[in-house]
Amino acid sequence: MGSEKEQRPEAHLPEEGEGAKPWRVDGSKDSQITPREDHGQESLLAGLHGTHPPKTRQKVTAQAGGPGDPMLFSSPETDEKLFICAQCGKTFNNTSNLRTHQRIHTGEKPYKCSECGKSFSRSSNRIRHERIHLEEKHYQCAKCQESFRRRSDLTTHQQDHLGQRPYRCDICGKSFTQSSTLAVHHRTHLEPAPYICCECGKSFSNSSSFGVHHRTHTGERPYECTECGRTFSDISNFGAHQRTHRGEKPYRCTLCGKHFSRSSNLIRHQKTHLGEQDEKDFS
């Protein structure tokens, strides 16, 4: 059985230019790199320090660990360091690039796409891949066929169909479909409302709500339906009205199948089913 030195294959630095001779490391720790032929030293140093070999010779040392470990080559005169892959001999100027390269040999893919589970060896490749999901709409609502890019967006949308409002304000009891909407609402209790109506004194936390309310005093109705000429002060009511002309009823009751043009009408309707259920429970 041979010694460790005999078992370990020689690690070669990449050749630089014509006539350069390969250098080798004997595998021992803190070993000095020696040329197979004496005149090859200038070619090695040209690769380490630039395109032109220095006039004076420098010592270049190599630190080697166990078999398969990367080797560190350094020049004491310039403090320049190169990290070499023990598998293929390719060199890198920092350990981060070396580790990324070594995943080619190990097959390691630590970066996983949260949407489809596909794995990648580089984080940049994963980011590039995830943009595909942002451009596609894979998640379709079975109720109204509207599509979404993210599963979480579909879940939020489906709560509108079901009339579910799982996020409840612990101060006033008002419920919301999204936690972010609840957070915005909750600030209205903690912060003084900056928008106060000079007509009735009612206060509002945002300018859009204040504007809708203020139009009830002024009588302004800026949203006009081109089909029938009816006007509205609130854009959401205007949008719901337009759906009546188009025959759209995207809000469907999952209990009886009835459709509605407004989510508020669906919620009001579903309460009738809850009342029926209460009567059955007590019968």
UniProtKB/Swiss-Prot annotation:
Keyword line: DNA-binding, Isopeptide bond, Metal-binding, Nucleus, Phosphoprotein, Repeat, Transcription, Transcription regulation, Ubl conjugation, Zinc, Zinc-finger
Top-level taxonomic group: Eukaryota
Transmembrane spans: none
Subcellular compartments: Nucleus
Numbered residues of crosslink Glycyl lysine isopeptide (Lys-Gly) (interchain with G-Cter in SUMO2): K81
Pfam families found in the cross-reference section: zf-C2H2, zf-H2C2_2
GO terms of molecular function: DNA binding; zinc ion binding
UniProt region (Disordered), positions on chain: 1-68
A single Gene Ontology CC term: nucleus
PTM annotation (Phosphoserine): residues: S43
Skewed-composition ranges (Basic and acidic residues): 1-41
Zinc finger residue ranges, C2H2-type: 83-105, 111-133, 139-161, 167-189, 195-217, 223-245, 251-273
Family, per entry: Belongs to the krueppel C2H2-type zinc-finger protein family.
Task of the protein: May be involved in transcriptional regulation.
Protein name (record): Zinc finger protein 691
Organism per entry: Mus musculus (Mouse)
Upper taxonomic lineage: Eukaryota, Metazoa, Chordata, Craniata, Vertebrata
Gene of this entry: Znf691
